[in-house]
Amino acid sequence: MTSQGPLYIGFDLSTQQLKGLVVNSELKVVHVSKFDFDADSHGFSIKKGVLTNEAEHEVFAPVALWLQALDGVLDGLRKQGLDFSRVKGISGAGQQHGSVYWGENAESLLKSLDSSKSLEEQLSGAFSHPFSPNWQDASTQKECDEFDAFLGGPEQLAEATGSKAHHRFTGPQILRMQRKYPEVYRKTARISLVSSFLASLLLGYIAPMDISDVCGMNLWDIKKGAYNEKLLGLCAGPFGAEDLKRKLGDVPEDGGLRLGKINRYFVERYGFSSNCEILPSTGDNPATILALPLRPSDAMVSLGTSTTFLMSTPSYKPDPATHFFNHPTTPGLYMFMLCYKNGGLAREHVRDAINEKSGSGASQSWESFDKIMLETPPMGQKTESGPMKMGLFFPRPEIVPNVRSGQWRFTYDPASDTLTETEDGWNKPSDEARAIVESQMLSLRLRSRGLTQSPGDGLPPQPRRVYLVGGGSKNKAIAKVAGEILGGSDGVYKLDVGDNACALGAAYKAVWAIERKPGQTFEDLIGQRWREEEFIEKIADGYQKGVFEKYGKAVEGFERMEQQVLKQEAARK
């Protein structure tokens, strides 16, 4: 590469910071600039990037903060010596579901920016509402209940929009805004998602929403490829569905569409080329699957404090417990997502109990946990026909399935299909080392059932690869059990892109959009250039004949166990 080759920027506008990451055509990172909202901003009384109103469970961010941040990140890149004139394309990733409310004067302000002044100075008056609801906001229970009931139940809402109603989703948030602040809503000319807000600043006029991020609203009918008219009507109330449709704008199907050239402001202030193209910005989760690139039927498991499971799949099989989005770049594929509240904490509870029993007390070492887990046979079965031990371990209330915090232990006999809630035969805490990891992985396998294909060679349907990210991905014993349960004909891999996944995915999206040949998919172009040895390491085998099938039987018992616990909990209320 000559040092004059094209460059591309991927932005990541998250809850606590804005990051700008620059790559070249070969996907090599050449610059990264960050603006930490708490540390680097001035004039906002935020904490961890947000403001809260606990009385109403509201969590929101001042939109002007993000204006300050964009100038801050670009200043940072300038100080690092970035030659802005080489930047050919820009895309971004935004925290999902958040909404920005533009006033009637927004487009005229965006078009007439003076490059000698900051964005914040000139655009603070461009918004009909100064705040954007954050994904942590929980103020919309009433609205969620209405959304869930409106098409006949949460199943029907998930079938249409990919998800049941959630507090953070944009539709319920707009409904609450329209009722609580009708005058603000009336004066709102356009509504952006956080991702399309970012693209709008760069373009100089309101950018359309992205085909994947629009699926996080409970308003977009995924199969029909259009807004659901009934849900728009519910959301808009007395203002009418047509008015809301105008506020939201059209949604282009091509995730790599060239929306337009960069706003003159950035050409004059930073030295961008006037030919720099702005591409659709997507949501943070869709951007994450672009950082790999994740191929159809590959699975990505984030083993952090909570557990997140992401998969690219050609199958659309929505369920109230899961999320489906359009794939951000590839028509015919969907992004499947599962979010759990319990993850690392539940595993640490068992680890600590084991260390305490063995006398290593306050140690945070995983050595004893790992040793015991690997010595325990799958499902704790002492013999081939013996009972399987399984349980649910939730230190905090769970959403998948929707139950209170607690622990439940069962034995399951696959031969007679009998399930018994009992602690008999459980050697606590030792048996729980394997049981906690199995419980978490069996839930993933249960809910991704039917989304995978056979990788060939007569193998049963399973992911081609399982990628692990987050703190838990460092643990090879957990990776081994994950592979035994989830499969992975090609193995289990640790993925390490630091905390840059969203920004990388956005930057790769820009490279693909500008450099693709006609009809060339993202997976093809990026797959050819991605140097996997820099980012991934194989840490465990995946599919093991016999063991994978045994866990297939365990999934049946696991599903019954969840249903029984849900029934018991419903009876308690």
Swiss-Prot record:
It is found in: Cytoplasm. It comes from the Eukaryota. It is an enzyme of class 2 (transferase). Its main location: cytoplasm. Its EC number is 2.7.1.17. It catalyses: D-xylulose + ATP = D-xylulose 5-phosphate + ADP + H(+). One of its GO terms (molecular function) is D-xylulokinase activity. Keywords: ATP-binding, Carbohydrate metabolism, Cytoplasm, Kinase, Nucleotide-binding, Transferase, Xylose metabolism. One of its GO terms (cellular component) is cytosol. Belongs to the FGGY kinase family. Highly specific D-xylulose kinase which participates in the catabolism of xylose. Xylose is a major component of hemicelluloses such as xylan. Most fungi utilize D-xylose via three enzymatic reactions, xylose reductase (XR), xylitol dehydrogenase (XDH), and xylulokinase, to form xylulose 5-phosphate, which enters pentose phosphate pathway. This is Probable D-xylulose kinase A. The gene is xkiA.
